[in-house]
């Protein structure tokens, strides 16, 4: 297994928080090229963890290794070159007067030549399907479109890791669906590691691996179908059951008993129901 991130015994405590720790001796590994969702209720420590990995927050104890580099004051900028972060509020991410200017901003800081910069900007805007909006101002865009521009800005710098810090939580259902599908496309087409910080179980179900945080500690990790099939853990952490599990349980309450292995498999449960209706 080739890990791109290793976190060992990470502890973080906010000032004036007493004995409460936002992160309490957290250790985890993230495989290169994978999509990992870090889930938990508000205050569970998931955003603190993401921002610690990117060097935006100085933790109290522990070690963070990103692609073979130990995070420190001397290496933080080397690590940030490898990571692109997309935050919750798209309005807080715009720094350019237009879409094109915003995507070019990071490239200008890297000293990229103008001709090459234009090619990169056009290419990434096409990838996120925003090439027809490059002269638009931020206030002329929807929330989902702004997040697409933020993703384009991240892709322009060719990161090895993309961290989505609650990046879909302020979007309407359609916008959320479009952004998650876009990230899924980018993940499938490129060797990019994706870390999604979320409390949206349906979003986390698309990932390869799920880590559940509760009160600063990891309480469960594994494949999404395994993790979200644990009703006791979901109750403890205040997370919702996936839609498929809700449907399965509702069928059982009505005296309809699908095979238990279909509880976390939406496509197979749908097919089973279709076959059941055809026999009726």
UniProtKB/Swiss-Prot annotation:
ATP binds at residues 40-47. The keyword Translocase applies. One of its GO terms (cellular component) is ATP-binding cassette (ABC) transporter complex. It is an enzyme of class 7 (translocase). The keyword Cell membrane applies. Keywords: ATP-binding, Cell membrane, Membrane, Nucleotide-binding, Translocase, Transport. It is found in: Cell membrane. Residues 5-240 form the ABC transporter domain. One of its GO terms (molecular function) is ATP binding. Transmembrane segments: none annotated. InterPro entries: AAA+_ATPase, ABC_transporter-like_ATP-bd, ABC_transporter-like_CS, ABC_transpr_CbiO/EcfA_su, ECF_ABC_transporter_ATP-bd, EcfA_1, P-loop_NTPase. It is a peripheral membrane protein. Pfam families: ABC_tran. It comes from the Bacteria. Its EC number is 7.-.-.-. Belongs to the ABC transporter superfamily. Energy-coupling factor EcfA family. ATP-binding (A) component of a common energy-coupling factor (ECF) ABC-transporter complex. Unlike classic ABC transporters this ECF transporter provides the energy necessary to transport a number of different substrates. Forms a stable energy-coupling factor (ECF) transporter complex composed of 2 membrane-embedded substrate-binding proteins (S component), 2 ATP-binding proteins (A component) and 2 transmembrane proteins (T component). This is Energy-coupling factor transporter ATP-binding protein EcfA. It comes from Pediococcus pentosaceus (strain ATCC 25745 / CCUG 21536 / LMG 10740 / 183-1w).
